[in-house]
Amino acid sequence: MNTQAATSPQFYLTAPAPCPYLAGEMERKVFTHLVGPRAPEMNDLLTQGGFRRSQNIAYRPACETCRACISVRIVAREFQPNRTMRRVAGVNADLTSSVFAAQPSTEQFSLFRTYLDHRHQQGGMSDMSALDFAIMVEDSHVKTKVIEYRLPKVDEDSDRPGELVAVALSDILSDGLSMVYSFFNPAMEKRSLGTFMVLDHIRRANEMGLPHVYLGYWVNGSRKMGYKIRFLPQEHLLSQGWTRYEPESGVEE
C-alpha cells in the first residue's frame, strides 16, 4: 500500500441542502476527517485555507452557484477597539475567565440549552441533547480548549464559583486562535457577551504571540454574521488569497 495515500486526507462532497443563511439558495460542503497524528497539522493548514472544524470534521462551502461565505480572520496585533468595544470591555471587567481541557459539564450544557432556546430555536442545533453537546466538545483530535467566563463569587469565602455566563470552544493553531463555537446567557444582553469573547480572544492571541483570530464565515447581508466585520483590521480569504478588508463608510470607529 502507498503510505502517502494511506495518510493523506480524503475529501468528500455533501448533497445539496437548503442554505441556512440565504433564503432560496442551496448549499454544498466539501469535508474531510481530522483524525490521527496529523490532525493538528491538517487543522492548521485547512483553517488557513478557509475550512472550519466541527467535531472531527473540517469543512468549507462548495456551493455550485454562490460564493457568499467568506472566511474572516482578525489581525490581532494591529487591532484597535472602537468606542463601543471599549464600553463592552469595561462593562465586563468584573468577569473572570478560565481555560480548561475540552471536557463538557452539566453547567455548560444548561447554559448552552438556554442560549439555543432563546437565539436559535429553528436552527440545526436546536434539538441537541446532552450527549450531542458532549460529543461537540470532546470529539477533537486537535488542540482544543474550553474558556469559561463567570461573574464574581456571591460569597468570597465560598468554594462555589460565580455564575457561568459565557463559554467559548476554541482551537489553538500555529498562527492564531480559531473560535469554533461560543454561547452565552441571552438574558445579559447589555453585556454584549459575544463581542466580549471575541475581544478576549484577541487579547489572548496577542499574549500568546499569535497573529490571528479566526471567526469563521461572514455572509454579506446576513444579520447573524454582521458582527464579524466590526473587528478591524481583518483579512478575508478571496480568490487571490488572504486580503485586507477595506470597510465601507459607516463602520463605527
Swiss-Prot record:
GO term, biological process aspect, one: ubiquitin-dependent protein catabolic process via the N-end rule pathway
An example Gene Ontology molecular-function term: leucyl-tRNA--protein transferase activity
Keyword Cell membrane: no
Keyword Cell inner membrane recorded: no
InterPro entries found in the cross-reference section: Acyl_CoA_acyltransferase, Asp_Glu_LeuTrfase, N-end_Aminoacyl_Trfase, N-end_Aminoacyl_Trfase_C, N-end_Aminoacyl_Trfase_N
Keywords assigned by UniProt, alphabetized: Acyltransferase, Cytoplasm, Transferase
Reaction(s) the record says it catalyses: N-terminal L-glutamyl-[protein] + L-leucyl-tRNA(Leu) = N-terminal L-leucyl-L-glutamyl-[protein] + tRNA(Leu) + H(+); N-terminal L-aspartyl-[protein] + L-leucyl-tRNA(Leu) = N-terminal L-leucyl-L-aspartyl-[protein] + tRNA(Leu) + H(+)
Cell location: Cytoplasm
Enzyme superclass (EC): transferase
Domain of life: Bacteria
PANTHER family: ARGININE-TRNA-PROTEIN TRANSFERASE 1 (PTHR21367), ARGINYL-TRNA--PROTEIN TRANSFERASE 1 (PTHR21367:SF1)
Function: Functions in the N-end rule pathway of protein degradation where it conjugates Leu from its aminoacyl-tRNA to the N-termini of proteins containing an N-terminal aspartate or glutamate.
Protein's name in the database: Aspartate/glutamate leucyltransferase
The species this protein was found in: Allorhizobium ampelinum (strain ATCC BAA-846 / DSM 112012 / S4) (Agrobacterium vitis (strain S4))
Lineage: Bacteria, Pseudomonadati, Pseudomonadota, Alphaproteobacteria, Hyphomicrobiales
Gene assigned in the entry: bpt
